[in-house]
């Protein structure tokens, strides 16, 4: 037997053996890990984590593939690589050579995001078995078969450069990047996701391919599926598409080590000043806070709302209402490791930035030491967050996308645990975190201008999320809605009409909705040619003032009442119409309708 024939036989035998092993592997079903409030986690033998959220009330399917790699994982010379790879994965595979076109043909669009801790790709499609199978085939194929070619890298470089230049020309974004880089001396959170221009433009294609092969593997990925689908069918297709992908070899350079770089405890104030072309000024401050999984984040969320809430926020009252600043905001970011609490103010070009910064310090550090947070402030903030979480959970698509961030923090169930913590946080908790983390010694300040005391703060380590969540069951699942036929004929049949004596027309579409959710849409048309003439601006001003209070409720009380009724949305108007859209729950619908009437009938136009 010739050597050439032996080689052919050997290769054929190897292929048969590999095919047989993959077939056996694919036939092994997934393992159910846990289930919380209607969401169930499974694990494939190759390590792929699968999260299913069936929602028959949604006529769509959202497929969200998250890879546990972001800019935090980039090595020296690799900054921007995770984001650059996100672009190249859309360039296709041999089986899916034109991904954007295929998505468009199915009524979806290319969607991908890169953050500090993760990268995700997602598509929302009409709920059919064919679309589900196609999306799963796409995601499994581009997990391991993306081209990642030098030609695609060159062609995409213009797009990436444009993103870089857009960020560099945005005063807020560039100041935030500079302030973060000063706040984090060693940790990769101090490097922007977009990366250094020199790294992005100079990265060898082979290095990018190595990054792709290392991190785009089933044992480093989480597949979230939400919407209208049959779990049994979905699991069968997931095993069929992803189960044949072998577990990667994690030896040598392919081993993924936990990131272990930690910044030393900050020992004094730091500051950054940017002088660039621009039309506005900014003052911002970053304080180090614990990781997103830490129990203090719930209290820090409440604290940020106490500072920046419109109408009652302390910074809003001190800076916006006094017209010293155009706007203020505060965010307690939730990352896998120790993250930032960002607070900033936007100031007019001719305003006094020094005066604004002095006021910011008085409010922030006064809140931490003297003018302590009150019970009413905590309750108002709690109602705001819990309302948004509750109403947001009515959208399975929204939850599917949110879970990417919670997965990257350590576990998708942290979403529910954080909600529970928000419900239980006390005023003393908020005062404690303010006193613990809001210290000048723990701050990095940034100023954008157009044209020190050794009191150290120890940041807790990332908690053991597995131990923390062992046995966690969550609450009862939200009541599912009906599987609604969205055809015009069915909508017409199900819609109930009524006309009042005054000519007011009412259309009602009763159906079982997820979480007993109700949406009210109101449209009032009025006016004639004489009343419309020269009144456009006046009409817009009147419409814009409707949500600022009534004879019974001032603006803050009106917002509180909407939160109490678990309603969101609003009423506005113009010179020829008024109306709005509000969302609430079924039991509160009568009260919400009464409130809409009050807003329209008895508004107060304070000077």
Predicted segments — roles?
Residues 2-16:
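Bacterial N-terminal signal peptides that target proteins for export
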Residues 17-26:
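Hydrophobic h-region of N-terminal signal peptides that target proteins for export
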Residues 25-50, 230-276, 317, 416-525, ...:
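Proteolytic maturation boundary segments
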Residues 53, 58-74, 80-81, 98-141, ...:
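M16 family metallopeptidases and their MPP-like homologs
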Residues 88-95, 549-551:
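Catalytic Zn2+-binding segment of zinc metalloproteases
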Residues 157, 172, 209-241, 442-443:
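Non-catalytic, conformational "gating/processing" segments within enzyme and secreted inhibitor domains
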Residues 161-167, 259-274, 381-392, 584-585:
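Short, conserved secondary-structure transition motifs
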């Amino acid at each position: 037997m010739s050597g050439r024939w032996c080689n052919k036989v050997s290769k054929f035998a190897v292929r048969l053996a590999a095919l047989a092993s993959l077939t056996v592997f694919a036939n092994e079903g997934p393992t159910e890990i846990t289930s919380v409030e209607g969401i169930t986690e499974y694990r494939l033998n190759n390590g792929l984590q699968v999260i299913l959220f069936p929602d028959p009330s949604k006529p769509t399917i959202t497929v969200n593939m998250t890879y546990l790699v972001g800019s935090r994982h980039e090595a020296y010379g690799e900054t921007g690589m995770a984001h650059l790879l996100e672009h190249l994965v859309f360039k296709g595979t041999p089986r899916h050579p034109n991904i954007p076109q295929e998505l468009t043909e199915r009524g979806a669009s290319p969607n991908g995001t890169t953050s500090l801790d993760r990268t995700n790709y997602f598509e929302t499609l009409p709920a059919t078995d064919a679309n589900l199978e196609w999306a799963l085939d796409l995601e499994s194929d581009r997990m391991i078969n993306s081209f990642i070619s030098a030609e695609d890298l060159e062609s995409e470089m213009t797009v990436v450069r444009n993103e870089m230049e857009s960020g560099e020309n945005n005063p807020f974004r560039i100041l935030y990047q500079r302030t973060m880089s000063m706040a984090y001396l060693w940790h990769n959170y101090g490097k922007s996701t977009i990366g250094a221009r020199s790294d992005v433009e100079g990265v060898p294609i082979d290095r990018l391919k190595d990054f792709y092969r290392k991190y785009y593997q089933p044992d480093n990925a989480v597949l979230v599926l939400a919407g209208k689908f049959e779990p049994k069918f979905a699991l069968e297709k997931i095993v069929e598409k992803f189960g044949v992908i072998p577990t990667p070899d994690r030896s040598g350079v392919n081993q993924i080590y936990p990131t272990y770089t930690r910044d030393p405890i900050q020992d004094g104030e730091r500051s950054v000043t940017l002088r660039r072309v621009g039309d506005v000024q900014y003052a911002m401050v970053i304080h180090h806070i614990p990781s997103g999984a830490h129990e203090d984040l719930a209290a820090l969320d409440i604290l940020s709302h106490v500072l920046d809430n419109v109408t009652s926020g302390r910074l809003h009252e001190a800076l916006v209402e006094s017209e010293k600043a155009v706007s203020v905001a505060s965010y307690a970011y939730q990352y896998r490791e120790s993250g930032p609490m960002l607070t900033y103010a936007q100031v007019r070009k001719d305003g006094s930035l020094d005066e604004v910064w002095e006021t910011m310090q008085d409010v922030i550090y006064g809140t931490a030491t003297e003018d302590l947070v009150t019970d009413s402030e905590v309750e108002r903030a709690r109602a705001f967050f819990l309302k948004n979480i509750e109403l947001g959970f009515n959208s399975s698509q929204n939850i599917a996308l949110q879970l990417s961030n919670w997965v990257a923090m350590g576990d998708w169930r942290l979403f529910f645990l954080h909600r529970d913590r928000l419900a239980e946080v006390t005023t003393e908790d908020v005062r404690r975190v303010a006193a613990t983390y809001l210290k000048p010694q723990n701050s990095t300040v940034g100023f954008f201008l157009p044209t020190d005391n050794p009191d150290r703060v120890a940041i807790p380590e990332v908690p053991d999320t597995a131990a923390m969540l062992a046995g966690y069951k969550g609450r009862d699942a939200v009541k599912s809605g009906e599987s609604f036929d969205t055809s015009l004929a069915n909508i017409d049949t199900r819609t109930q009409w009524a006309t009042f004596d005054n000519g007011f027309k009412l259309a009602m579409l009763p159906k079982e909705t997820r979480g007993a959710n109700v949406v009210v849409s109101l449209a009032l048309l009025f006016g004639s040619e004489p009343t419309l003439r020269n009144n456009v601006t006046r009409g817009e001003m009147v419409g814009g003032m409707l949500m600022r209070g009534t004879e019974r409720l001032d603006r803050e009380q009106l917002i509180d009442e909407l939160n109490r009724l678990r309603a969101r949305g609003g009423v506005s108007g113009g010179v020829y119409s008024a109306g709005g859209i509000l969302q609430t729950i079924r039991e509160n619908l009568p009260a919400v309708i009464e409130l809409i009437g009050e807003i329209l009938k008895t508004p107060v136009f304070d000077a």
